[in-house]
């Protein structure tokens, strides 16, 4: 089996990069979301209940309990955590020595601490996915850093036998994510997914589209439907190939997943989610595929024994059979036909919901057994490598580490089976009770989660959008435009990846229902009426662009509109819209309606203030850092960090010694010398044999 040391390093660097984006993006929004004058102050979530420290940390796992000991309030503690997380992630991205389990443990603890107080603004599937992936990175990271100079035939020398084992969990996580995301689209009974028309709405109605989404939206309908078919193929049929014994099948699965994620990044602003999914796909690669050495990538055709030749032929036959079955199944179940007159491909769903439910009931448990068999094989390979370890002390040390990591891997696999089985209730009930108990004991730590993206297509008939309006007299109203979400019909959609403006995202969810389903919206209205600058900066990072920057509005209200992308011929607008209804009534400070809502949602409650000193040096340092960074728009800050990483890596590459090339040349010279010696020896031997035959033949005649 091919080694995966290079993919593991790519995975660890990718996780560090995603942590970097996640921490930095969250840092820019803390004052407006969680500060004392924010929409949902974080201090409301941490109220001491007289419990011991360790019990408190276990039940509510966040380091922010310790913020008062440092003289910080909860929001400042969150500032400190996100800054430290950003610096640690930057270090892990740039330095091999910092890709250590302890560093990834600190990153996971920091993000888990922020998640605990993040409330609705951090309740996204990608936040849970980052926590689960981040925990796996703790296990994948080697205890000793890889050396750049100890590379032997593409595999790092001195590799321990168990180092590939935890990396298998990354592949299992990718399988759960993709398979569940495909299945839930059909189990939801959403008519757009079943009718293959989902993408005719998706580009227009997704939370934060990019400019490319406008162009994608105007593609032909038949191409949209064919794209939905391809999505089902990639998300449902391809994931089992992650565990295929034939590496070319796994590589095909990798490129299919990568293509899907890149297309989503181009057409939608999904922050770090698709980047994180791409990081997970590294588990499908191996050193041979990624190595730059010709000796690993290109092999001379050497004569092989007939069993190997037969095995190669059978593998090729099996590979072609799999591709044929995928093609046949796609054509059959989605009724693909070519209309030669119109030059289009027709498609339709040819199976029923009942048939799909029966199929799902049939295959879900076998996929569990597929994962079990794959893990069992990995364990056998690891045990075989351990047996081959030389030296009793090294074997004993490797055995201890193998026992710990093997137990952790099996335990995490069992834990993950419970959320995975949610896709099919029958399978959920048939799981081993021990797995349920194990999952229940650690569920609050977010070690394993259920996934299912784009379950239903919203916005059919136009995307709903909430538009805030302010007034001084209650008669003349001015729209309050957000930086990122659709508002001004003439403004093009932005490109924000990897930043996630969490208020803009929640505004999209709020528009899908009544305002009472989004209690935080009342908190937003209150802070804007009070003129709180941290919240205003969430709406407009440059306060001068906020229409009420000189004096807060006396009245606020919200209207619900429906938005559509403009037609291709309309050059002056990206959107057109239509008023639907009032979303939030006109209120002012002290208004009985507003006071009732604040009381109903608990937004008037005040927790005890955290003890802190006004002359605290740490607090002053945190305030100074924020003052320096606040003028930068969040996307610019994140892309600036990324640019700095790229620049440093380029400099590192240029200044690094290049022992590989010289060693490669040395090996090449030795090989040539050896081949010359062998050929010279062979010629001498042939001459000697010839002479001996010549001298022996006449004697035989006599």
Swiss-Prot record:
It holds the Pfam family LMF1. GO terms for cellular component: endoplasmic reticulum membrane. It is a multi-pass membrane protein. It is found in: Endoplasmic reticulum membrane. GO terms for biological process: protein maturation. The chain crosses the membrane at residues 10-30, 75-95, 164-184, 226-246, 259-279, 316-336, 363-383, 398-418, 636-656. Residues 660-702 are annotated as: Disordered. Residues 665-681 have a biased composition (Basic and acidic residues). Residues 682-693 have a biased composition (Low complexity). Glycans are attached at residue 488. Keywords: Endoplasmic reticulum, Glycoprotein, Membrane, Transmembrane, Transmembrane helix. The keyword Transmembrane applies. Belongs to the lipase maturation factor family. This is Lipase maturation factor 2. It comes from Mus musculus (Mouse).
């Amino acid at each position: 089996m091919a080694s995966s040391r290079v993919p593991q390093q790519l995975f660890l660097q990718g996780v560090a990069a995603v942590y970097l984006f996640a921490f930095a993006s969250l840092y820019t929004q803390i004052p407006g979301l969680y500060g004392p004058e924010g929409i949902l102050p974080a201090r409301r979530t941490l109220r001491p209940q007289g419990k011991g420290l360790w019990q408190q940390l276990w039940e509510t796992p966040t380091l922010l309990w310790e913020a008062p000991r440092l003289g910080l309030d909860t929001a400042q503690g969150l500032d400190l955590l996100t800054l430290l997380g950003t610096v640690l992630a930057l270090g892990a991205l740039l330095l091999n020595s910092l890709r250590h389990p302890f560093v990834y443990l600190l990153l996971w603890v920091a993000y888990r601490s922020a998640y605990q107080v993040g409330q609705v603004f951090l309740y996204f599937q990608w936040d849970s996915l980052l926590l689960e992936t981040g925990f796996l990175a703790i296990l994948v990271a080697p205890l000793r850093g890889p050396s750049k100079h100890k590379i032997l035939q593409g595999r790092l020398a001195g590799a321990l036998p168990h180092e590939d084992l935890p990396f298998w969990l990354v592949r299992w996580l990718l399988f759960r994510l993709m398979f569940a995301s495909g299945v839930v689209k059909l189990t939801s009974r959403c008519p757009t997914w079943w009718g293959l028309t989902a993408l005719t709405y998706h580009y227009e109605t997704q939370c934060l589209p990019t400019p490319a989404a406008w162009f994608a939206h105007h593609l032909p309908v038949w191409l949209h439907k064919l794209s939905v078919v391809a999505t089902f193929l990639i998300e449902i049929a391809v994931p089992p190939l992650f565990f295929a014994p034939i590496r070319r099948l796994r590589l095909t699965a990798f490129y299919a997943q990568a293509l899907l994620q890149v297309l989503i990044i181009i057409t939608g602003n999904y922050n770090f989610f698709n980047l994180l999914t791409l990081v997970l796909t590294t588990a499908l690669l191996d050193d041979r595929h990624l190595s730059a050495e010709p000796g690993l990538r290109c092999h001379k055709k050497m004569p092989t024994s007939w069993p190997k030749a037969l095995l190669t032929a059978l593998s090729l036959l099996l590979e072609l059979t799999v591709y044929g079955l995928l093609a046949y199944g796609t054509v059959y179940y989605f009724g693909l036909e070519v209309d030669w007159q119109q030059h289009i491909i027709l498609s339709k769903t040819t199976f029923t919901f009942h048939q799909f439910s029966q199929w799902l009931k049939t295959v879900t448990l076998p996929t569990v057994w597929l994962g079990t068999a794959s893990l069992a094989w990995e364990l056998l390979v690891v045990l075989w490598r351990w047996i081959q370890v030389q030296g009793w002390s090294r074997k004993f040390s490797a055995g201890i580490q193998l026992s710990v990591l093997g137990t952790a891997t099996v335990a995490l696999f069992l834990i993950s089976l419970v959320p995975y089985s949610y896709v099919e209730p029958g399978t959920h009930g048939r799981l081993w009770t021990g797995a349920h108990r194990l999952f229940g004991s650690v569920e609050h730590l977010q070690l394993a989660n259920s996934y299912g993206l784009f379950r239903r297509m919203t916005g059919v008939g136009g995307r709903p959008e909430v538009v805030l309006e302010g007034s001084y007299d209650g008669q003349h109203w001015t729209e309050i435009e957000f930086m990122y979400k659709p508002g001004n019909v003439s403004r093009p959609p932005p490109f924000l990846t990897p930043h996630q403006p969490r208020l803009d995202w929640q505004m999209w969810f709020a528009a899908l229902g009544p305002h009472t389903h989004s209690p935080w919206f009342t908190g937003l209205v209150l802070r804007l009426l009070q003129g709180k600058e941290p919240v205003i900066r969430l709406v407009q990072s440059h306060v001068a662009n906020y229409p009420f920057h000189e004096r807060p509005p006396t009245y606020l209200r919200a209207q619900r509109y429906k938005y559509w992308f403009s037609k291709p011929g309309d050059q002056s607008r990206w959107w057109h819209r239509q008023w639907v209804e009032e979303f939030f009534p006109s209120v002012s400070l002290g208004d009985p309606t507003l006071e009732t809502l604040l009381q109903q949602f608990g937004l008037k409650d005040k927790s005890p203030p955290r003890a802190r000193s006004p002359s605290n040096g740490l607090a002053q340092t945190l305030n100074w850092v924020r003052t320096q960074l606040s003028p930068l728009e969040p996307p610019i800050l994140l892309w600036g960090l990324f640019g700095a990483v790229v620049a440093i890596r380029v400099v590192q590459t240029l200044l690094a010694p290049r022992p590989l090339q010289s060693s490669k040349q040395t090996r090449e010279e030795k090989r040539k010398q050896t081949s010359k010696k062998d050929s010279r020896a062979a010629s001498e031997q042939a001459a000697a044999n010839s002479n001996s035959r010549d001298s022996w033949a006449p004697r035989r005649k006599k």
